[in-house]
Amino acid sequence: MSNSFHLAIPAGNLKKAEDFYTKILGCKTGNREDGKWVDIDFWGNELTLHQTEMKLPRERHDVDMGNVPVPHFGVHLKKEIFNQI
């Protein structure tokens, strides 16, 4: 991973979360501690998914792009790359 940004998030079911990032989005995995956490190469940034049991409260805020969940994160992609996914 070449960028300096790192984000660690609760993932719930780690296997399902890893499958989403790798099989759907096409991200690669990095370091891991089986059953506890896995690093995802999120377009050059390190995203660490942590196995969790606790549910986070659902909260939404109205912003310029509509009613969005908080917290949230994403990646800005060129349209061509987005369409490939």
Regions found by a protein language model. Give the residues of each.
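Vicinal oxygen chelate
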Residues: 1-4, 28-79, 85
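Conserved active-site tyrosine of GNAT-family acetyltransferases
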Residues: 17-22
